[in-house]
Design a protein with these regions (language model features):
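Phosphate-coordination loops involved in phosphoryl transfer and adenosine-cofactor binding
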Residues: 4
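Alpha4 helix (beta4-alpha4-beta5 surface) of REC/receiver domains from two-component response regulators
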Residues: 92-113, 117-121
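Two-component/phosphorelay signaling modules centered on CheY-like receiver
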Residues: 14-41
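CheY-like receiver
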Residues: 118-142
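Conserved acidic carboxylate
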Residues: 11-12, 91
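Conserved phosphotransfer microenvironments
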Residues: 43-84, 94
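Hydrophobic/aromatic residues located in beta-strands of well-ordered beta-sheets
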Residues: 37, 86-87
């Protein structure tokens, strides 16, 4: 049996995205799961392919930026449908991360455009925590 964790990444900065992907590749090597990724780079894609698609409802993790180069916001994602416990907010603007918190998001990593590698490390660490078999084992014991 193949174990898969599905991750939705909403990020339009391709350099940041490449850093996150490089770190997720390392995470995948340390886990019993394959990582299945869906990457969207504009807010209209979120509306068309996620919010309005009844089949797009099974993500384990959502990595969520806020701003989109098209002038919209990735916060158009239907948080309630997917569950705020699955979301990692990664805006470089503290106010935008606070917006996500007000909607129930608990995991926030301030994007640091000066220290991109360190930022990507933090994202990968949070993903690792969220998919860790030990975490799943602990949840089942409660």
């Amino acid at each position: 049996m193949i174990l898969i964790k599905k991750i939705l990444i909403l990020e339009d900065n391709l350099l940041i995205l490449s850093k996150i992907l490089a770190k997720l590749e390392i995470v995948e090597q340390d886990q019993p799961y394959l990582l299945s990724l869906v990457i969207l780079t504009d807010f209209q894609q979120v509306e068309d392919y996620i919010n309005n698609n009844p089949k797009a409802n099974n993500f384990d993790i959502i990595i969520l930026d806020r701003d989109c180069k098209l002038g919209g916001s990735f916060h158009n994602l239907n948080f309630e449908r997917f569950g705020t416990d699955k979301v990692i907010s990664i805006s470089a603007v503290p106010e935008y991360n606070n917006e996500a918190k007000k909607r129930g998001v608990k995991r926030v990593i301030l994007k640091d455009l000066k220290y991109k590698d360190e930022f990507a490390d933090k994202v990968a660490t949070e993903v690792r925590r969220m998919i860790s078999p030990q975490r799943l084992f602990n949840l089942k014991l409660r």
